């Protein structure tokens, strides 16, 4: 489990390899990740957008930006949380993801809440030791 906190917004990510959606012989590796966002702060916030950096095992980086998460822009009162699960296909058996959520306060102030960097590791990864 990976965690980061920014201005009272705790983001926890738990990734997993999804064998049934993967086809290693065709260089297709699918990963799911569950995110929990907890408002440990003292004011209401709303998740407005997301920004992901996805880096595969060869070092190729893809950036993804979009409004909200899974079609929602949740509002979190102090003490509330929101969880969702999404997925990421890669052409390599490993990689990593990191990013941020743009949050806004009830007063209209925006800030970036860090999504912790987390590794995507499949059992098909062959490690070479010299």
Swiss-Prot record:
Q: Where is the ApaG domain?
A: 3-127
Known InterPro entries for this protein? ApaG_domain, ApaG_sf, Uncharacterised_ApaG
Coiled coil spans:
none
Extract the Pfam families matched here. Answer: DUF525
PROSITE patterns in the cross-refs: APAG
Q: Which domain of life is it from?
A: Bacteria
Example of a GO biological process term? error-free translesion synthesis
Q: What is this protein called?
A: Protein ApaG
Q: Which organism is the protein's source? A: Methylorubrum extorquens (strain PA1) (Methylobacterium extorquens)
């Amino acid at each position: 489990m990976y965690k980061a906190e920014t201005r009272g917004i705790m983001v926890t990510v738990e990734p997993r390899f999804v064998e049934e959606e993967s086809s290693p012989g065709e260089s297709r590796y699918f990963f799911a990740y569950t995110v929990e966002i907890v408002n440990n702060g003292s004011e209401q916030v709303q998740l407005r957008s997301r920004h992901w950096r996805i880096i595969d095992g060869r070092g190729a980086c893809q950036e993804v930006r979009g409004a909200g998460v899974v079609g929602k822009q949740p509002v979190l009162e102090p003490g509330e949380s929101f969880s969702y699960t999404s997925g990421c296909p890669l052409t390599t058996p490993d990689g990593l993801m990191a990013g941020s959520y743009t949050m806004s306060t009830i007063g209209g102030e925006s800030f970036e809440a860090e999504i912790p960097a987390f590794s995507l590791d499949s059992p098909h990864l062959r490690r070479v030791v010299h």
